[in-house]
């Protein structure tokens, strides 16, 4: 188990913190025109029967009896929280070794596909267990309330956090890191697994002092695949999604595209495809043009550009395979990647990209949690009216039914709501609907904004400071990295803190994506302040 016996803290990574909706969806694949699942018809029938009989309280998810997890482990503090449950630090009673325990509440498994997703995630983790640079599952347990997945504890935090704390950053270091990431992809693909949600925050370190102790986590969207199999479900994170995924016809080549995006971010600090809205990002991805000329691409070698072009080839059949990437001259051992420091603007950009909108997202969560039943009863009725199949989720076709409530929402607000909710899954559940609607609902907006601001400004000074953000992150078990960047992104008068007017401007701005102007202005401030380098 390597370093699993050591103490450590990390954010919500184990619990899919950045997959606001994706946890619920995965794992349908299509061969030709025939849709299949990972489970037999009889298995699906038994699951459906279990749901009808009250799965949430009594029925088994794993399909076999397990010991009581609390007889073997002591569950400690919360490490993260996600849609289906929470992740805790746990200590094995017999050895004293520490692990991470992902607890998935059965009450949150509302349909057959939810149960299948949990089973498949566990199957894939067992299938890949013991492979280098992939988080190791120790065991699974089930009781009447929850399923518990015990895995090794990645105590070193996020890989990208470590990168951004370095004072010197070079192409050679980027090549070493992307070699690890593509090596993980090669391992997955050779074992018949497609990850489908690779992104920087899904790579953690076992040991903060060892940059090569990288572990890939979060297989909640991963699937088994066969050669030639075609997948049609749109999943993933907007900046990293491959064009063929958006076109609903893809295979494992999509993971290579994602790695190419990560490499671009490593070298420049910004993603290759971005816009002010998610739909705008998707348009850029489908267009496929890569910027190698602007000042966002300073002093990068031709060999690195060549590799990125081949990893971000818009045609999957012509895109490099994982083993071909590892043989590229820029990335292989003793390759041509230079050890010369990258342009000094890269690390501030990388930090800014990692921290973008984190304060806004946290603030929206705080507002949503504090809404009274009276404030959300109208939205609840809207959701129920759209949820015609009583599945506790609605599709985007159903979401368009909001137009019948035009007295509350304008057409432009409905479009914004759809973009805010859309993480490429094409569905949204109740909690997600509320959190997305919070930023658009004009009713008593001032009251909600003041409540969120006050959550941070507990001493009533009228300002949000780095220290206050740190305390808020501790309260919510979030990583407190790059707090200065969170301030910097919102601080308009450069006084190092956020006043209420600046906070309101941030919250009311329609910046679901990361626009270049936002980064450019923030970057200029960052360079003036010359900070030392998630």
Swiss-Prot record:
Residues that bind Ca(2+) 2: 423, 425, 427, 432
Keyword line: ATP-binding, Calcium, Kinase, Lipoprotein, Membrane, Metal-binding, Myristate, Nucleotide-binding, Phosphoprotein, Repeat, Serine/threonine-protein kinase, Transferase
CDD domains registered for this protein in UniProt: EFh, STKc_CAMK
GO molecular-function terms, A-Z: ATP binding; calcium ion binding; calcium-dependent protein serine/threonine kinase activity; calcium/calmodulin-dependent protein kinase activity; calmodulin binding; protein serine kinase activity
Binding site for ATP: 79-87, 102
Membrane topology: Lipid-anchor
Sequence positions that bind Ca(2+) 4: 491, 493, 495, 497, 502
Record InterPro entries: CDPK_Ser/Thr_kinases, EF-hand-dom_pair, EF_Hand_1_Ca_BS, EF_hand_dom, Kinase-like_dom_sf, Prot_kinase_dom, Protein_kinase_ATP_BS, Ser/Thr_kinase_AS
Pfam families reported for this sequence: EF-hand_7 (PF13499), Pkinase (PF00069)
Region (Autoinhibitory domain), start-end ranges: 337-367
Covalent lipid adducts (N-myristoyl glycine), residues: 2
Listed GO biological process terms: intracellular signal transduction
Residue ranges occupied by any EF-hand domain in the UniProt entry: 374-408, 409-443, 444-479, 480-513
Signal peptide range: none
Binding site for Ca(2+) 1: 387, 398
Residues reported in the UniProt entry to bind Ca(2+) 3: 457, 459, 461, 468
Active site per database record: 197
Reactions mediated catalytically: L-seryl-[protein] + ATP = O-phospho-L-seryl-[protein] + ADP + H(+); L-threonyl-[protein] + ATP = O-phospho-L-threonyl-[protein] + ADP + H(+)
Domain Protein kinase, residue spans: 73-331
Coiled-coil segments: none
Purpose of the protein: May play a role in signal transduction pathways that involve calcium as a second messenger. Involved in the activation of sucrose synthase 2 (SUS2) in developing seeds.
Entry similarity comment: Belongs to the protein kinase superfamily. Ser/Thr protein kinase family. CDPK subfamily.
Stated name of the protein: Calcium-dependent protein kinase 23
Species of provenance: Oryza sativa subsp. japonica
């Amino acid at each position: 188990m390597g370093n699993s016996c050591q103490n450590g803290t990390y954010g919500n990574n184990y619990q899919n913190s950045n997959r606001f909706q994706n946890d619920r969806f995965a794992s349908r694949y299509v061969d030709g025109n025939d849709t299949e699942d990972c489970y037999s018809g009889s298995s699906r029938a038994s699951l459906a029967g279990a749901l009808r009989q009250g799965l949430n309280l009594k029925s088994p998810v794993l399909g076999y009896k397990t010991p009581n997890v609390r007889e073997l482990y002591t569950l400690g503090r919360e490490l993260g929280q996600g849609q289906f449950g929470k992740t805790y630090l746990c200590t094995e009673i017999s050895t004293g070794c520490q692990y991470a325990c992902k607890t998935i509440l059965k009450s949150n498994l509302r349909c057959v596909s939810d149960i299948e997703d949990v089973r498949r995630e566990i199957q894939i983790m067992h299938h890949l267990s013991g492979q280098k640079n992939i988080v190791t599952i120790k065991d699974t347990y089930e009781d009447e309330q929850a399923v518990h997945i015990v895995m090794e504890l990645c105590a070193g935090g996020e890989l990208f956090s470590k990168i951004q704390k370095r004072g010197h950053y070079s192409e050679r270091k980027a090549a070493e890191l992307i070699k690890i990431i593509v090596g993980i992809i090669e391992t997955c693909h050779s074992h018949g697994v497609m990850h489908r949600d690779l992104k920087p925050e899904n790579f953690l370190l076992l040991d903060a002092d060892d940059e090569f102790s990288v572990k890939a986590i979060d297989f909640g969207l991963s699937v088994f695949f066969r050669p030639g199999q075609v997948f049609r479900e749109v999943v993933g994170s907007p900046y990293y999604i491959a064009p063929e995924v958006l076109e609903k016809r893809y295979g494992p080549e999509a993971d290579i595209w994602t790695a190419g995006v990560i490499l671009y971010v490593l070298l420049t600090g910004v993603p290759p495809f971005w816009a002010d809205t998610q739909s705008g990002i998707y348009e850029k991805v489908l267009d496929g043009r890569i910027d190698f000329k602007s000042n966002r691409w300073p002093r990068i070698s031709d060999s690195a550009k060549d590799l990125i072009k081949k990893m971000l080839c818009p045609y999957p059949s012509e895109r490099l395979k994982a083993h071909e990437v590892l043989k590229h001259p820029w990335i292989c051992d003793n390759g041509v990647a230079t050890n010369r420091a990258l342009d000094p603007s890269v690390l501030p950009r990388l930090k800014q990209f990692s921290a973008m909108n984190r304060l806004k997202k946290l603030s929206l969560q705080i507002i949503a949690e504090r809404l009274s039943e009276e404030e959300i009863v109208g939205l609840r009725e809207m959701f129920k009216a759209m949820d015609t199949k009583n599945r506790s989720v609605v599709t985007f076709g159903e979401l368009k039914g909001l137009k019948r409530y035009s007295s509350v929402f304008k057409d432009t607000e409905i479009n914004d709501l759809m973009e805010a909710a859309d993480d490429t899954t094409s569905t949204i559940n109740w909690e997600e609907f509320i959190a997305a609607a919070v930023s658009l609902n004009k009713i008593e907006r001032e009251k909600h904004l003041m409540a969120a601001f006050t959550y941070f400004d507990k001493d009533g000074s009228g300002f949000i400071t780095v220290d206050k953000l740190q305390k808020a992150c501790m309260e919510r078990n979030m990583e407190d990295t790059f707090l200065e960047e969170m301030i910097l992104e919102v601080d308009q008068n450069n006084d190092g803190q956020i006043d209420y007017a600046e906070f309101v401007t941030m919250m009311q701005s329609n910046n679901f994506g990361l626009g270049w102007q936002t980064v450019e202005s923030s970057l200029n401030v960052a360079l003036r302040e010359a900070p030392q380098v998630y």
